Protein backbone atom coordinates (compact mmCIF):
# COMPACT_ATOMS: atom_id res chain seq x y z
CA UNK A 1 0.00 0.00 0.00
CA UNK A 2 1.39 3.38 -1.04
CA UNK A 3 0.84 6.90 0.27
CA UNK A 4 0.37 9.75 -2.18
CA UNK A 5 3.33 12.17 -1.91
CA UNK A 6 0.95 15.11 -1.38
CA UNK A 7 2.93 17.46 -3.60
CA UNK A 8 2.81 21.22 -3.21
CA UNK A 9 0.27 22.34 -5.86
CA UNK A 10 2.62 25.21 -6.75
CA UNK A 11 5.47 24.02 -8.96
CA UNK A 12 7.46 27.25 -9.22
CA UNK A 13 7.46 30.46 -7.19
CA UNK A 14 8.47 33.52 -9.21
CA UNK A 15 8.29 36.35 -6.71
CA UNK A 16 4.60 37.15 -6.25
CA UNK A 17 3.68 34.77 -9.06
CA UNK A 18 2.96 31.09 -8.45
CA UNK A 19 3.05 28.60 -11.32
CA UNK A 20 0.82 25.68 -10.42
CA UNK A 21 1.47 22.13 -11.54
CA UNK A 22 -1.81 21.85 -13.40
CA UNK A 23 -1.08 24.99 -15.41
CA UNK A 24 2.42 23.70 -16.08
CA UNK A 25 0.95 20.45 -17.37
CA UNK A 26 -1.14 22.41 -19.87
CA UNK A 27 2.10 23.93 -21.16
CA UNK A 28 3.72 20.49 -21.34
CA UNK A 29 0.67 19.15 -23.18
CA UNK A 30 0.86 21.75 -25.92
CA UNK A 31 4.65 21.38 -26.28
CA UNK A 32 4.20 17.63 -26.71
CA UNK A 33 1.48 18.26 -29.28
CA UNK A 34 3.89 20.44 -31.26
CA UNK A 35 6.59 17.75 -31.12
CA UNK A 36 4.23 14.99 -32.28
CA UNK A 37 2.84 17.27 -34.99
CA UNK A 38 6.33 18.04 -36.33
CA UNK A 39 7.14 14.33 -36.37
CA UNK A 40 3.99 13.69 -38.39
CA UNK A 41 5.17 16.17 -41.01
CA UNK A 42 8.02 13.77 -41.77
CA UNK A 43 5.60 11.09 -42.96
CA UNK A 44 5.43 11.20 -46.78
CA UNK A 45 1.65 10.85 -47.03
CA UNK A 46 1.17 13.63 -44.46
CA UNK A 47 3.66 15.96 -46.14
CA UNK A 48 1.92 15.32 -49.47
CA UNK A 49 -1.25 16.87 -48.01
CA UNK A 50 0.53 20.22 -47.74
CA UNK A 51 0.70 20.53 -43.95
CA UNK A 52 3.31 22.99 -42.63
CA UNK A 53 4.81 23.90 -39.22
CA UNK A 54 2.78 27.13 -39.32
CA UNK A 55 -0.39 25.05 -39.63
CA UNK A 56 0.55 23.25 -36.42
CA UNK A 57 1.18 26.51 -34.55
CA UNK A 58 -2.12 28.02 -35.70
CA UNK A 59 -3.97 24.78 -35.02
CA UNK A 60 -2.71 24.73 -31.44
CA UNK A 61 -3.80 28.34 -30.92
CA UNK A 62 -7.33 27.33 -31.88
CA UNK A 63 -6.98 24.15 -29.83
CA UNK A 64 -5.94 26.00 -26.67
CA UNK A 65 -8.97 28.27 -26.85
CA UNK A 66 -11.29 25.35 -27.57
CA UNK A 67 -9.85 23.26 -24.75
CA UNK A 68 -10.06 25.95 -22.08
CA UNK A 69 -13.45 27.38 -23.01
CA UNK A 70 -15.06 24.05 -23.87
CA UNK A 71 -13.53 22.27 -20.88
CA UNK A 72 -14.77 24.88 -18.45
CA UNK A 73 -18.28 25.28 -19.83
CA UNK A 74 -18.57 21.52 -20.28
CA UNK A 75 -17.84 21.06 -16.58
CA UNK A 76 -20.41 23.72 -15.73
CA UNK A 77 -23.13 22.12 -17.87
CA UNK A 78 -22.42 18.41 -17.42
CA UNK A 79 -21.40 18.21 -13.78
CA UNK A 80 -22.54 21.18 -11.65
CA UNK A 81 -25.22 23.00 -13.63
CA UNK A 82 -27.46 23.65 -10.62
CA UNK A 83 -24.61 25.10 -8.57
CA UNK A 84 -23.44 27.48 -11.28
CA UNK A 85 -27.00 28.47 -12.09
CA UNK A 86 -27.29 29.66 -8.50
CA UNK A 87 -23.74 31.13 -8.47
CA UNK A 88 -23.14 32.34 -12.06
CA UNK A 89 -20.01 34.37 -11.27
CA UNK A 90 -18.28 31.21 -10.05
CA UNK A 91 -18.14 30.08 -13.69
CA UNK A 92 -15.17 32.41 -14.14
CA UNK A 93 -13.24 31.12 -11.08
CA UNK A 94 -11.14 28.73 -13.15
CA UNK A 95 -8.36 28.79 -10.55
CA UNK A 96 -10.63 26.78 -8.27
CA UNK A 97 -10.56 23.89 -10.76
CA UNK A 98 -13.29 22.23 -12.75
CA UNK A 99 -12.60 21.11 -16.31
CA UNK A 100 -14.40 18.47 -18.37
CA UNK A 101 -12.66 16.44 -21.07
CA UNK A 102 -15.91 15.92 -22.94
CA UNK A 103 -16.58 19.66 -22.87
CA UNK A 104 -13.02 20.31 -23.99
CA UNK A 105 -13.52 17.79 -26.79
CA UNK A 106 -16.58 19.68 -28.02
CA UNK A 107 -14.69 22.96 -27.74
CA UNK A 108 -11.75 21.62 -29.75
CA UNK A 109 -14.14 20.16 -32.32
CA UNK A 110 -15.70 23.57 -32.88
CA UNK A 111 -12.23 25.18 -32.97
CA UNK A 112 -11.07 22.70 -35.62
CA UNK A 113 -14.17 23.44 -37.71
CA UNK A 114 -13.16 27.12 -37.69
CA UNK A 115 -9.56 26.23 -38.52
CA UNK A 116 -10.64 23.98 -41.38
CA UNK A 117 -12.89 26.71 -42.78
CA UNK A 118 -10.06 29.23 -42.59
CA UNK A 119 -7.61 26.85 -44.31
CA UNK A 120 -10.20 25.68 -46.86
CA UNK A 121 -9.78 22.06 -45.78
CA UNK A 122 -12.40 19.55 -44.76
CA UNK A 123 -13.03 19.19 -41.04
CA UNK A 124 -12.08 15.50 -41.08
CA UNK A 125 -8.75 16.22 -42.77
CA UNK A 126 -7.91 18.45 -39.83
CA UNK A 127 -9.11 16.07 -37.12
CA UNK A 128 -7.27 13.15 -38.75
CA UNK A 129 -4.06 15.17 -38.54
CA UNK A 130 -4.72 16.24 -34.95
CA UNK A 131 -5.85 12.87 -33.54
CA UNK A 132 -2.38 11.36 -32.83
CA UNK A 133 -1.31 14.63 -31.17
CA UNK A 134 -4.00 14.49 -28.48
CA UNK A 135 -3.09 11.49 -26.23
CA UNK A 136 0.23 12.97 -25.08
CA UNK A 137 -1.65 16.03 -23.90
CA UNK A 138 -4.22 13.89 -22.13
CA UNK A 139 -1.42 12.07 -20.30
CA UNK A 140 0.08 15.39 -19.17
CA UNK A 141 -3.29 16.53 -17.86
CA UNK A 142 -3.81 13.33 -15.89
CA UNK A 143 -0.31 13.65 -14.47
CA UNK A 144 -1.36 17.07 -13.23
CA UNK A 145 -4.40 15.48 -11.58
CA UNK A 146 -2.16 12.93 -9.86
CA UNK A 147 0.32 15.55 -8.65
CA UNK A 148 -2.58 17.57 -7.24
CA UNK A 149 -3.93 14.44 -5.53
CA UNK A 150 -7.37 14.89 -7.12
CA UNK A 151 -9.79 12.75 -9.13
CA UNK A 152 -8.70 9.69 -7.17
CA UNK A 153 -10.12 6.23 -7.64
CA UNK A 154 -12.61 4.14 -5.72
CA UNK A 155 -11.82 2.40 -2.45
CA UNK A 156 -10.02 -0.90 -2.91
CA UNK A 157 -8.44 -3.65 -0.82
CA UNK A 158 -5.34 -2.64 1.17
CA UNK A 159 -3.73 -5.85 -0.11
CA UNK A 160 -3.87 -4.67 -3.72
CA UNK A 161 -0.31 -3.81 -4.85
CA UNK A 162 -1.57 -0.62 -6.52
CA UNK A 163 -3.61 0.62 -3.52
CA UNK A 164 -2.80 4.22 -2.56
CA UNK A 165 -3.80 6.53 0.28
CA UNK A 166 -4.85 10.02 -0.84
CA UNK A 167 -4.79 12.68 1.93
CA UNK A 168 -7.30 14.78 0.02
CA UNK A 169 -9.86 11.98 0.21
CA UNK A 170 -9.77 11.67 4.02
CA UNK A 171 -13.16 13.29 4.59
CA UNK A 172 -14.82 11.12 1.96
CA UNK A 173 -13.11 8.05 3.40
CA UNK A 174 -14.75 8.56 6.78
CA UNK A 175 -18.17 8.73 5.14
CA UNK A 176 -17.42 5.69 2.98
CA UNK A 177 -16.92 3.53 6.07
CA UNK A 178 -20.41 4.44 7.24
CA UNK A 179 -22.15 3.82 3.92
CA UNK A 180 -20.30 0.59 3.00
CA UNK A 181 -20.10 -1.42 6.26
CA UNK A 182 -20.05 -4.86 4.60
CA UNK A 183 -17.20 -4.02 2.23
CA UNK A 184 -15.31 -2.28 5.02
CA UNK A 185 -15.58 -5.39 7.19
CA UNK A 186 -14.46 -7.70 4.38
CA UNK A 187 -11.31 -5.66 3.74
CA UNK A 188 -10.70 -4.75 7.42
CA UNK A 189 -10.74 -1.09 6.45
CA UNK A 190 -11.70 0.18 9.89
CA UNK A 191 -8.25 -0.90 11.08
CA UNK A 192 -6.59 0.83 8.13
CA UNK A 193 -8.53 4.03 8.77
CA UNK A 194 -7.69 3.93 12.48
CA UNK A 195 -3.99 3.80 11.59
CA UNK A 196 -3.81 6.19 8.63
CA UNK A 197 -7.08 8.18 8.82
CA UNK A 198 -7.42 7.37 5.12
CA UNK A 199 -8.58 4.45 2.98
CA UNK A 200 -6.73 2.72 0.13
CA UNK A 201 -7.94 3.75 -3.30
CA UNK A 202 -7.20 3.07 -6.94
CA UNK A 203 -4.72 5.60 -8.39
CA UNK A 204 -7.08 6.00 -11.33
CA UNK A 205 -5.15 9.01 -12.67
CA UNK A 206 -2.25 6.64 -13.42
CA UNK A 207 -4.61 4.21 -15.16
CA UNK A 208 -5.78 7.06 -17.35
CA UNK A 209 -2.20 8.05 -18.17
CA UNK A 210 -1.56 4.47 -19.27
CA UNK A 211 -4.75 3.95 -21.30
CA UNK A 212 -5.73 7.41 -22.56
CA UNK A 213 -2.12 8.52 -22.93
CA UNK A 214 0.35 5.75 -23.72
CA UNK A 215 -1.86 3.04 -25.22
CA UNK A 216 -4.06 5.41 -27.22
CA UNK A 217 -1.02 7.27 -28.55
CA UNK A 218 0.64 4.05 -29.72
CA UNK A 219 -2.56 2.86 -31.41
CA UNK A 220 -3.10 6.17 -33.22
CA UNK A 221 0.55 6.66 -34.13
CA UNK A 222 0.89 3.19 -35.63
CA UNK A 223 -2.50 3.41 -37.34
CA UNK A 224 -1.77 6.79 -38.93
CA UNK A 225 1.74 5.97 -40.14
CA UNK A 226 0.14 4.65 -43.34
CA UNK A 227 -2.37 6.41 -45.58
CA UNK A 228 -5.91 5.86 -44.30
CA UNK A 229 -9.36 6.89 -45.55
CA UNK A 230 -10.44 10.38 -44.55
CA UNK A 231 -12.10 10.19 -41.14
CA UNK A 232 -10.53 6.87 -40.12
CA UNK A 233 -7.95 8.26 -37.68
CA UNK A 234 -10.59 10.49 -36.11
CA UNK A 235 -12.87 7.47 -35.71
CA UNK A 236 -10.13 5.41 -34.06
CA UNK A 237 -9.54 8.24 -31.60
CA UNK A 238 -13.23 8.37 -30.67
CA UNK A 239 -13.39 4.61 -30.17
CA UNK A 240 -10.07 4.39 -28.34
CA UNK A 241 -10.67 7.26 -25.96
CA UNK A 242 -14.26 6.25 -25.33
CA UNK A 243 -13.27 2.68 -24.45
CA UNK A 244 -10.33 3.79 -22.29
CA UNK A 245 -12.39 6.33 -20.33
CA UNK A 246 -15.37 3.98 -19.99
CA UNK A 247 -13.07 1.28 -18.56
CA UNK A 248 -11.17 3.51 -16.14
CA UNK A 249 -14.40 4.96 -14.78
CA UNK A 250 -15.08 1.61 -13.07
CA UNK A 251 -12.05 2.34 -10.87
CA UNK A 252 -12.50 6.12 -10.62
CA UNK A 253 -14.52 7.67 -7.81
CA UNK A 254 -17.72 9.23 -9.21
CA UNK A 255 -18.24 12.93 -8.63
CA UNK A 256 -19.72 13.29 -5.14
CA UNK A 257 -22.43 15.69 -6.33
CA UNK A 258 -23.58 13.27 -9.05
CA UNK A 259 -22.74 9.76 -7.90
CA UNK A 260 -23.67 6.91 -10.20
CA UNK A 261 -26.46 7.43 -12.70
CA UNK A 262 -28.72 5.03 -14.63
CA UNK A 263 -27.51 1.41 -14.88
CA UNK A 264 -24.88 2.14 -12.26
CA UNK A 265 -22.76 4.12 -14.74
CA UNK A 266 -20.99 7.40 -14.05
CA UNK A 267 -21.42 10.63 -15.97
CA UNK A 268 -18.05 10.03 -17.62
CA UNK A 269 -19.24 6.66 -18.89
CA UNK A 270 -22.52 8.03 -20.23
CA UNK A 271 -20.62 10.78 -22.04
CA UNK A 272 -18.16 8.23 -23.46
CA UNK A 273 -20.79 5.91 -24.94
CA UNK A 274 -21.81 8.35 -27.72
CA UNK A 275 -18.12 8.75 -28.59
CA UNK A 276 -17.71 5.00 -29.03
CA UNK A 277 -20.88 4.67 -31.11
CA UNK A 278 -20.00 7.68 -33.27
CA UNK A 279 -16.49 6.32 -33.76
CA UNK A 280 -17.71 2.92 -34.95
CA UNK A 281 -20.20 4.52 -37.36
CA UNK A 282 -17.56 6.93 -38.66
CA UNK A 283 -15.00 4.14 -39.18
CA UNK A 284 -17.46 2.04 -41.19
CA UNK A 285 -18.46 5.09 -43.21
CA UNK A 286 -14.83 6.03 -43.93
CA UNK A 287 -13.87 2.61 -45.28
CA UNK A 288 -17.08 2.12 -47.24
CA UNK A 289 -16.71 5.56 -48.78
CA UNK A 290 -13.10 4.78 -49.62
CA UNK A 291 -14.12 1.46 -51.17
CA UNK A 292 -16.75 3.13 -53.34
CA UNK A 293 -14.24 5.75 -54.47
CA UNK A 294 -11.72 3.06 -55.39
CA UNK A 295 -14.35 1.10 -57.31
CA UNK A 296 -15.43 4.21 -59.22
CA UNK A 297 -11.82 5.02 -60.07
CA UNK A 298 -11.27 1.47 -61.34
CA UNK A 299 -14.44 1.73 -63.45
CA UNK A 300 -13.27 4.98 -65.02
CA UNK A 301 -9.85 3.58 -65.83
Curated annotation (Swiss-Prot):
GO terms for biological process: lipoprotein biosynthetic process. A 1,2-diacyl-sn-glycero-3-phospho-(1'-sn-glycerol) binds at residue 142. It is an enzyme of class 2 (transferase). It is a multi-pass membrane protein. Its EC number is 2.5.1.145. Belongs to the Lgt family. Catalyzes the transfer of the diacylglyceryl group from phosphatidylglycerol to the sulfhydryl group of the N-terminal cysteine of a prolipoprotein, the first step in the formation of mature lipoproteins. This is Phosphatidylglycerol--prolipoprotein diacylglyceryl transferase. The gene is lgt.
Amino acid sequence: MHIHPNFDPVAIHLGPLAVRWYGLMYLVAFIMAIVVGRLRLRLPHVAAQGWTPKDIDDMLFYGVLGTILGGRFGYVLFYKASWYFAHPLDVFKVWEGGMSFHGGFLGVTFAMILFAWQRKRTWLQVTDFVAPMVPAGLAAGRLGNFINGELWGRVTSPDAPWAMLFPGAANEDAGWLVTHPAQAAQWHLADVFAQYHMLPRHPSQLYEIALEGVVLFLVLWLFSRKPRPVGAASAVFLIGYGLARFTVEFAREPDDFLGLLALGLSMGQWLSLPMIIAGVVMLLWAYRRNGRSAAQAAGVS
